[in-house]
Amino acid sequence: LRWVVGDMWKRVAYWVGLFAALLLLFACQKPLFMWYNALKPLAFKDYIEAMWHGMSLDATVAGYLTAIPLLLLLVSVWAKRFPLRKIMRPYWILVAIVLAIVFVVDTALYAFWGFKLDATVFNYLDSPSEAFASVSVGFIVAGVIIISLTATLFTYLLLWITPKRLDKVRHQIVGTFFLLLIGGGLFVFIRGRVT
């Protein structure tokens, strides 16, 4: 067991750290959303309760986002030197951009729309001018700048967590089985949260 843990530690630590970082990232977004859109001062416990209440959904999203990294960790077990960060870079850039857009748009437009982003937003895809009819050009420009900065910050964080490369595991079969167990647990976790 000692040599298995020793070989797999870097991979497991990365995945657990990544999952925790995404949870923390999502949790920190809630107080910012509440602070920006609050009509009256909120107590500290209100922020904590919101973060706790959203933890279940945040964990589900984090599970989906860490599924691809887990698959790559599985592949890395059989590679001599696996350039994980290089391979993950496009994925994390895309994820960071999407997360930044959702967070900033949701936070900024809640005061105009009166509801958080959901499937309703797709009703405006054919007529985006209606969606932003009550928003000034300056507001949109500021939003684009904030989205860019937020996406850059998210990208830096996700790439910083990701190891530059992973070395080959000495006992590939055991390592593969170990990661498959984690993957199975993740699948059950996601399915349980969704249903």
Positions of predicted regions on the chain:
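Cytosolic-side transmembrane helix boundary signature
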Residues: 79-80, 148-178
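Membrane-interfacial interhelical loops
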Residues: 28-57, 90-147, 191-195
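Hydrophobic cores of alpha-helical transmembrane segments in multi-pass inner/ER membrane proteins
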Residues: 60-73, 143-159
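Cytoplasmic juxtamembrane interface segments
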Residues: 3-6, 67-93, 161, 166
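Alpha-helical transmembrane segments and their helix-start/interface "positive-inside/aromatic belt" motifs
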Residues: 7-20, 83-97, 173-177
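Hydrophobic alpha-helical membrane-embedded or membrane-associated segments
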Residues: 14, 18-25, 57-65, 94, ...
